[in-house]
């Protein structure tokens, strides 16, 4: 009688291939959103059939990236500041937490309208948008932030700024671990520059130590 074929090594190999394809897709699509699946397969070091075995088409690959981004975002949000933290510190904390997530998945921003659809990206970002709006509302009540704009409107403006900064990272015009972005966000929210820098210098080291897992 023949022995059953061991499946565990095959499953591990399949998981490894899938993870490598996704990591390659993040990198290559960030460089060129028009990269083809065939080009991604070559860059990942797998044959075309292996890639299509995991992802039957471009839409399936992008949806897998979107789901991965959503999971990483939720995990990062679990490290958000405590509710009692002053709003300026909470906003700096949150910006620093989100920066590496945005940096890793910034290619989704370029693909949002054409491939994923604005609604899918909005679904992924909904928890982060709600958190920032809540911080701004609390800061306005506490007199930390001015009330020149409704919190939801200001939140949208700050998000657009982060997207613009990430695009500059994508082009190589900006190098940032999130510190400069956090200062810019606080200033845009109405915090004086000197105080914004002091807040980020205070909050930054502990938050930056919580890096995303390596690729």
How should these model regions be labeled?
Residues 110-119, 201-202:
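Short linear capping/connector segments at secondary-structure termini
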Residues 1-5, 134-141, 167, 171-215:
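C-terminal peripheral helix-coil segments that are non-catalytic and often amphipathic
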Residues 21-28, 51, 73, 98:
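Short hydrophobic clusters on alpha-helical segments that form packing/core surfaces
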Residues 68, 116-167:
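Amphipathic alpha-helical packing segments from all-alpha helical-bundle domains
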Residues 55, 60-69:
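Alpha-helical DNA-contacting segments of helix-turn-helix folds
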């Amino acid at each position: 009688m023949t022995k059953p074929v061991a499946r565990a090594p095959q499953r591990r190999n399949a998981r490894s291939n899938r993870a490598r394809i996704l990591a390659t897709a993040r990198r290559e699509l960030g460089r060129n959103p028009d990269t083809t699946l065939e080009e991604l397969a070559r860059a990942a070091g797998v044959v075309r059939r292996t890639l299509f075995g995991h992802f039957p088409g471009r839409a399936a690959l992008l949806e897998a990236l979107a789901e991965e981004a959503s999971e990483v975002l939720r995990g990062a949000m679990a490290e958000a500041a405590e509710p009692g933290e002053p709003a300026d510190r909470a906003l700096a904390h949150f910006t620093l937490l989100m920066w590496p997530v945005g940096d890793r998945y910034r290619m989704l921003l370029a693909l949002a309208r054409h491939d994923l659809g604005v609604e899918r990206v909005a679904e992924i970002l909904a928890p982060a948008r709600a958190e920032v709006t809540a911080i701004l509302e609390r800061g306005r009540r506490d007199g930390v932030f001015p009330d020149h704009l409704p919190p939801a409107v200001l939140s949208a403006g700050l998000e657009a700024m982060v997207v613009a900064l990430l695009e500059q990272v994508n082009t190589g015009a900006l190098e940032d671990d999130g510190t400069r972005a956090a200062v810019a966000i606080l200033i845009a929210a109405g915090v004086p520059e000197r105080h914004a820098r002091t807040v980020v210098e205070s909050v930054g080291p502990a938050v930056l130590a919580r890096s995303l897992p390596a690729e």
